[in-house]
């Protein structure tokens, strides 16, 4: 074992003070416990150090086995060429090492109270982070693990995952300050308008470390080339190509994801919003946009900020378009009995077919636990 490999074993087996916050967050390269986002990718200290040494010392590697070696915690030192290639595929950037601009921050600022690069003294973003954290504890899976070996999703797996996400969305919305201020009819209108977009956005961001699949909350994967669920696979392919890949290219961080989700949620053009609540919704969206812009300015080089801000906002139109196709697929699944559609999904995504559309002032959605 080389000195460098001994150092990696040492850093992998000993926890830094920060690493205790990442007990369930995994390295995108080898699957070991991650200690943060390093050089553009979630990684452990071992892979972080390996990538840094490779770039700084300008190492060049050759694989003896056709560049098909498995890279995991146990075998990551077996082939440096394949390991380095995985580092690059997962988003590590040479320039982050060369210019020392890598901002090492927790990938999950919600788990340890860290602001993860948030603009100082921004109470609105702090509120959004707390809202996200309030539902994070309800999740039964960790969204940052790699999932190459995960089970192929069935139709029921897809709808089960959607049910879980919609339940979390309702609980998330209840915590939002702007949501609490509007009337019940507007609350339901916002939830219905955003429900499918929420599914698309969450699936896209959760799958940011995958290249050919959407990772669902119930530990299953929806691969874009699998023939099992052709309609859903087409949606998965669009999510990957039009949302996940751009998120990865932009190195979108969790604060930006949280803010963009809230911008999409508080849409003053959502069908069914009352005239009394319209200005409240519009004002809330404007406030979030301003905080979002300040955050992007804070974390981006000055010359890149306007383009980055625009590109992040340009993720919204494809998410809306994909969400409409997703609603159609759910409608077809219900029509032909292809999957179980629970009451919450029915009320949110197919309100015209639900059982409770007559009483708009006391919506069962808000009573869902």
UniProtKB/Swiss-Prot annotation:
Its main location: nucleus. It comes from the Eukaryota. It holds the Pfam family Hormone_recep. Residues 67-142 bind DNA. InterPro entries: HNF4-like_DBD (IPR049636), NHR-like_dom_sf (IPR035500), Nucl_hrmn_rcpt_lig-bd (IPR000536), Nuclear_hormone_rcpt_NR2 (IPR050274), Nuclear_hrmn_rcpt (IPR001723), Retinoid-X_rcpt/HNF4 (IPR000003), Znf_hrmn_rcpt (IPR001628), Znf_NHR/GATA (IPR013088). Residues 120-352 form the NR LBD domain. It is found in: Nucleus. One of its GO terms (cellular component) is nucleus. Keywords: DNA-binding, Metal-binding, Nucleus, Receptor, Transcription, Transcription regulation, Zinc, Zinc-finger. A zinc finger (NR C4-type) spans 70-90, 106-130. GO terms for molecular function: nuclear receptor activity; nuclear steroid receptor activity; RNA polymerase II cis-regulatory region sequence-specific DNA binding; zinc ion binding. CDD domains: NR_DBD_HNF4A. One of its GO terms (biological process) is cell differentiation. Belongs to the nuclear hormone receptor family. Orphan nuclear receptor. This is Nuclear hormone receptor family member nhr-64. It comes from Caenorhabditis elegans.
């Amino acid at each position: 074992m080389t000195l460098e490999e001994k150092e990696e074993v040492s850093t992998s087996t000993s926890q830094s003070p920060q690493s205790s916050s990442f007990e369930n967050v995994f390295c995108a390269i080898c699957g070991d416990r991650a200690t943060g986002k390093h050089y553009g990718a979630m990684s452990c200290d071992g892979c972080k150090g390996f990538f840094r040494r490779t770039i700084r010392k300008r190492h060049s590697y050759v694989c003896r086995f056709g560049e098909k070696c498995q890279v995991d915690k146990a075998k990551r030192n077996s082939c440096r060429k394949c390991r380095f290639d995985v580092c690059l595929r997962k988003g590590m950037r040479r320039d982050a090492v060369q210019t020392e601009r890598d901002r090492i921050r927790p990938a999950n600022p919600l788990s340890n109270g860290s602001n993860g690069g948030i603009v100082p003294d921004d109470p609105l973003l702090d509120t959004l982070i707390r809202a996200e954290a309030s539902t994070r504890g309800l999740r039964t899976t960790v969204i940052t693990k790699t999932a190459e070996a995960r089970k192929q999703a069935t139709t029921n797996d897809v709808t089960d995952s959607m049910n879980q996400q919609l339940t979390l969305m309702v609980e998330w919305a209840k915590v939002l300050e702007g949501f609490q201020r509007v009337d019940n009819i507007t609350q339901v209108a916002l939830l219905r308008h955003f429900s499918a977009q929420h599914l698309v956005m969450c699936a896209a961001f959760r799958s940011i470390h995958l290249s050919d699949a959407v990772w669902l909350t119930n530990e299953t994967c929806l691969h874009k080339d699998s023939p099992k669920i052709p309609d859903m696979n087409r949606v998965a392919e669009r999510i990957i190509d039009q949302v996940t890949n751009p998120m990865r290219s932009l190195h979108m961080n969790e604060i930006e994801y949280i803010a963009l989700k809230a911008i999409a949620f508080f849409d003053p053009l959502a069908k069914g919003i009352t005239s009394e609540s319209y200005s409240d919704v519009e004002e809330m969206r404007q406030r979030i946009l301003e905080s979002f812009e300040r955050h992007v300015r804070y974390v981006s080089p000055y010359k890149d900020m306007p383009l980055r801000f625009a590109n992040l906002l340009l993720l919204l139109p494809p998410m809306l378009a994909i969400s409409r196709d997703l609603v159609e697929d759910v409608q077809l699944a219900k029509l032909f009995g292809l999957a179980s559609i629970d009451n919450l999904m029915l009320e949110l995504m197919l309100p015209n077919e639900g059982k409770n559309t007559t009483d708009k002032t006391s919506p069962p959605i808000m009573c869902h636990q």
